[in-house]
Amino acid sequence: MKGTIVLYPAMGRGHIVPMVELGKFLSTHHHATLSVKILLPSPPNSTTLRYITAVSAATPSITFLHLSPSQHLLRVLQTLISQSSKPKAFILDFFNHSAADVTQTLNIPTYYYFPNAASCVALMLYTPTIHHNTKNGNSSYNDTLRRIPGLPPLSPEDMPAPLLDRRSFESFANMSIQMRKSDGIIVNTFEKLENKAFLALKNGTCVSETSRSHSSTPETRKPRIFCVGPLVSNGGGEHDNDDSGCMSWLDLQPSRTVVFLSFGSYGRFSKSQIREIALGLERSGQRFLWVVRDPYERSELSLEELLPKGFLERTKERGMVVKNWAPQVKVLSHDSVGGFVTHCGWNSVLEAVSWGVPMVAWPLYAEQRLNRVVMVEEMKVALPLKEVDEDGFVRASELEERVRELMDSERGRGKEVRKRVLGATNDAVAALSDGGSSRIELNDLVGLWMQ
């Protein structure tokens, strides 16, 4: 009889897709022993729904259960148990941490899944130590950020906004303690991509300081870590009819000559910043494909209203601008794309690494500033953009210089990041191949469930 594994992603494409990709991998490689069920928060947006529909058709062994807001998780799990048997494991997104109370009540082995960098997990696990040291006056907040195990020295500006607020920080520290009590933490990364953070997680140095300053309890134990990535979408469920024409346009461009600019589902700029980006691209002289979303001041503006007068006409021979959305995986995997200006969302980073595309790092929100530090200083697969103020405004001249530098594959930093990302691509393929580090971790995980 197959063992049932239940996956519970948080809302949002950036959380649903990597969780579903984990389910796909488990179902594909362990179909004889595992039955995978995914609880979906309802309702997903149209883009995510297309993706889920495509996965469901291609991998019918996965069962998708759509949760309505009124459904209680306890009743859903009790129904699953009555229909078959108790799940072998329950894997939840860290944003759904309250679900652990339910799974522990039912005595179901519980794992947290991070669709984030190992560096972010290391920071998360270290938050109780930061809280303890700063609260007791052992060290300042700034000093503590410079010595987080597995991470390069950080500044407060590199931290996610909630970790700069005392009350929110305490909530994250408490969440970290709860995670340490779990059966394990699964991370969408691989050993060679983030080796220092990987070792810090595996060796438990992210929690060891807390353990030294407290008696040994479940709150201070080292959780088991499983790095299983890169688990990324293959583009299934993205538009096949090329409504915008961007894929047809890419077909006409020379190999590795186009820089792609896209900033995620929530990446919006002011109208003035959009115009600054346009000027930088025009002056760079590079071919480009740019996804423009409405500015946060107004919506439903045409490209002509958003962009500098005459920009589209002046750049039509070497550039294309599309409104709101492009099939990112298909774009990054296209032969003509040679660079990526990204908001540093972890899914986007893994997609670029998987397809060998070097990046310019332009973080906007959440943990993306932390990702930038790691991408630039540790992974060395991206160039940083300099911002002129605390709101993150970037001048046209800065974007112009970085895009030119990135697309110059013959010399300087552009050549170096291209070399590094191509090496990371090979490492990514190896990690998920038979005998690779991530494949071994996944097999070990399944072995634990089926004992």
From Swiss-Prot:
Q: Which residues form the active site?
A: 15, 93
Q: What induces it?
A: Down-regulated by methyl jasmonate.
Q: Indicate what this protein is called per its UniProt record.
A: UDP-glycosyltransferase 13
A GO molecular-function descriptor? isoflavone 7-O-glucosyltransferase activity
Broad EC category: transferase
Superkingdom in the source lineage: Eukaryota
Q: Which family does it belong to?
A: Belongs to the UDP-glycosyltransferase family.
The entry's UDP-alpha-D-glucose-binding residues are 326, 328, 343, 346-348, 351, 367-368
